[in-house]
Amino acid sequence: MKARLAFHDKQVLADGSIVEMKIWELPESARGSKHRLKYSLFYGWPGRRLVGYDNERGKGDHRHVQDKEEAYAFSTPEQLIEDFLADVRRSRGES
């Protein structure tokens, strides 16, 4: 079984910034992760990430906020999306 795209949502906001979320189901867990999901969540402009969550092979679950990278404690896809959108709102000064 190859990776299957389980969720994809992309929005271009009024200021031209992009919020894009992709989650794939994998046949087995990726190196560095304890779950069978691969994900890439992005907020920013082309070429300029302000907030990002991903689990790049070998790095495991982590997030980027501005220029800071830190480990992320993945629990569920729903919580992942909730945490990401909360960081997006904070980055936009909305909360």
Predicted regions and their residues:
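Short, compact, well-ordered microdomains
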Residues: 68-95
